[in-house]
Amino acid sequence: MEPDWSSLESAARAALPRAYAPYSRFPVASAIQFADGAIVAGVNVENASYPLSLCAERAAVAAGVAGGHGPVRAVLVLTDAVEPTPPCGGCRQVLAEHGAPDVPVRAVTLQGRTAEHRLGALLPDAFRPASLDGRNPPPPRDVW
């Protein structure tokens, strides 16, 4: 399935005004296309206790998993930055748990600048369930 970049960007643009970023003043929206074709958006939600803040990409992954949509197939990240902003390291790790290394990740600015990478290029040698070497494997996923 080819990513529906137009719908992904529309979903992220619709979500961006709902970002809660009073501390960084750096709102971020993400839209993820899942294996079943569903597109789910997320926004960053900051907290006065900074480590408890939630990134837009992780919010979208969590909503997609809760909705039973299956593996990640494409990711779009939208900001009002001058340069396209790819996912942070923590989000890259979460995306690697739910998507394959060939998943396209597109960073877009409100002004239309874009950068695109494959998830595996953003996080080579990701820590994955197989990294546990068979100890404590995750339970089977009936949904996927």
What are these regions (language model features)?
Residues 44-58:
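Compact, glycine-rich, soluble single-domain proteins
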Residues 24:
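Active-site segments that bind and position negatively charged phosphate/pyrophosphate groups
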Residues 2-21, 69-144:
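C-terminal binding/interaction regions
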